[in-house]
């Protein structure tokens, strides 16, 4: 006698979501930012890989938002692209409306609010927002996927952070 399947459609959705997050977390990447008295240094790798497959060697994880602010991200590439395009559009709208560029602090709060607004279906991107503040000092803001952020002296994001963080700690 054949037994009926106990799996329902409600058990498949969490499996799919967990698979997508597992797959996205296996993408090798690294973003590093260091803030100084009057500078910010940002570095990010350009490789997209999954397992043993290299999908691209020329992908830029860093996007210039204003003359004083850049963002670098690690995570799912589609979400990174979408987030960067959304932030660029919001910066252009701000510039058109107020006839000036937003400050690094304003963009830090904007990014946190944007990520938090998607907390129930998060944007799978771990970001470092870097720039010069109003006093001309370097600022690095580190984010998680749901918008929590903190101002840092240096930041490391991505699956390669286990290798990058000890170097910066010294």
Question: What annotation goes with each model-predicted range?
Answer:
Residues 1-170:
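Long, low-complexity N-terminal extensions
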């Amino acid at each position: 006698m054949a037994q009926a399947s106990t799996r329902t459609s409600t058990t498949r959705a969490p499996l799919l979501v967990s698979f997508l997050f597992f797959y996205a977390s296996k993408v090798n990447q690294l973003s590093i930012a260091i803030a100084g008295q009057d500078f910010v240094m940002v570095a990010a790798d350009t490789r997209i890989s999954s397992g043993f497959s290299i999908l691209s060697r020329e992908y830029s994880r860093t996007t210039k938002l204003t003359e004083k602010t850049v963002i670098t991200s690690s995570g799912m590439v589609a979400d990174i692209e979408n987030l960067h395009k959304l932030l660029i559009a919001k910066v252009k709208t701000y510039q058109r409306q107020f006839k000036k560029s937003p400050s690094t602090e304003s963009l830090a709060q904007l990014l946190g609010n944007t990520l938090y607004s998607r907390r129930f279906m998060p944007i799978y991107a771990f970001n470092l927002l870097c720039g010069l503040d109003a006093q001309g000092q370097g600022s690095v803001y580190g984010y998680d996927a749901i918008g929590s952020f903190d101002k840092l002296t240096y930041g490391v994001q991505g699956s390669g952070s286990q290798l990058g963080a000890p170097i910066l700690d010294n």
